[in-house]
Amino acid sequence: VGLIFAILSRTSLGNVQIFESKEHDSTNQDNRALALSNGSRLILEEIRVWDRLEKKITKIKKIHTSQAGSFGRTMLDTEEFNEESLGYIISYGDLMGALQEEVECIRNVKISYETKVTKCMDEKPSLNLTLQTKNKTKKFKSEFVVLADGSTEGIEGLELNKKIKHFNHAAIVTKVLSEIPHRNIAYERFTSNGPIALLPNKEDKFSLVWTGPLKFIEDLKKLNDECFLSQLHESFGDRVGSFEECEKRISFDLKQTHVEVMHSNIVALGNASQTMHPVAGQGLNTGFKDAYKLSQSLRDDLNTKNLETLINDYKQSRVSERKKILGFTELLVKSFSNDLVGFKKARGYALTLLDISRPIKQSFVRKMSYGE
């Protein structure tokens, strides 16, 4: 998200300096799957990065949603909505590589790798940063700072109001090979232990995201591959046949965070601003939109407003939209991770209504694809 903002702002700002704590090539082999919406694709097209990614992405042509042990299912299909795709799967390493290549072509944008910001002192009109590299400590002065892509913990001088909501759930992610090829279909299966998402990913494998109660996910991670795949098949059903192999499993706790920056000349974007449950797949795409909206404000209003006013206006404009996205995600979590009497039946009716009502389908797809 930070790289996207820098590329988008290359003509609005003078010199842009990016500080990255990791090594230059540290993300190249990172195969974590990212789900990009059509709105994010448009942003990547605008910054001339999409062409580099087209041969590396996997298109989602259909989305099949159902729940275990009850009626109700829906199928979303690109042919219904005149869309090339309902979303795209790309590896984190491929996305970062393409963004880094583009940044290295821009004269006024520079990246310093293996450089950690340890202090950010607000001494108006400037911000004074303390940087730690491998060999020494440096100072850097700026009138405007963007926090993006990562934790802000441990940066002295930052005043943040952070709200955290714990779901008492975790996620386990891996790649799995199924008996039946994915055919560019993504699956969302709601079970009594939490949602299972299977996302088509390159060589006929699926990227799996399985969320559920902490203890359940912990137990899944302890299983050997054969038992894990058997449990997955039992929970997911037969739509893609049996599961034949899986890669290394990674798990992490799920929480929703919202960070309010208390400085008038500092903005947080991406997961430095908010994190959310993966059930709706909106976390990264919201970060893309944050970066786009802020760069748009700089481009359109920097000549008529002072920087402090512009930043405040941007923050206010994003408050209501962020609340809607976080609220929508939380609603999905509560609605589809609840097995109380009546909920399963209500979910079945909701999925059936979504499947048979074209206007509701269109509205849902617009929201998930473009955030509208």
Outline where the language-model segments fall:
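Glycine-rich FAD pyrophosphate-binding loop
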Residues: L8-R32
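FAD/FMN-dependent oxidoreductases across multiple families
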Residues: F216-T304
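Conserved FAD-binding catalytic core of PHBH/FMO-like flavoproteins
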Residues: T137-K139, F144-G241, E245, R249
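N-terminal Rossmann-fold NAD(P) dinucleotide-binding loop
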Residues: G2-L3
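Conserved N-terminal helical subregion
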Residues: L42-E46, R52, K56-L158, K165-A171
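C-terminal helical "tail/cap" subdomain of flavin- and related membrane-associated enzymes
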Residues: Q296-E372
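A general structural signal for well-ordered alpha-helical segments in protein cores
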Residues: S37-R41, Y92-M96, Q100, H169, ...
